[in-house]
Amino acid sequence: MRKDFGAKPYTYPQPVLMIATYGEDGKPDVMNAAWGGISDDKEISICVSENHKTTENILKKGAFTVSMADVEHMTACDYVGIVSGNKEPDKFEKAGFTAEKSDKVDAPIIKELPICVECKLKSYDKETCRLIGEIVNVSVDES
């Protein structure tokens, strides 16, 4: 038996999106986003409030990467979603992640995660918290 829910934005299950940036000091930062997805051929949309360290970095640097969490790294991915970069500046390293500089955008690739979408900031709406990135490249670990 099915239950109707009406017109809702349900596209579950969703991947856990890991948003990575560099701070002004060059340190990598990462958080997980509760909502996001592909919104056009070369566009990704993510809802992130402006009080996140990661959002601040994106607005200053104009770039970010989006990696997909995997089962092997779920604990680390959960950790960076719970701990604030404003309070714990070394959370990227404490999670056990290794940063590799993207040669396409000014943002880190998380070496441990298999898929990375490299993006340039296209727009950010403070009212709706909607961040839109232009997809510049997608890299996949072949191992």
State where each predicted segment sits:
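Active-site-proximal mixed secondary-structure blocks
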Residues: 1-31, 37-143
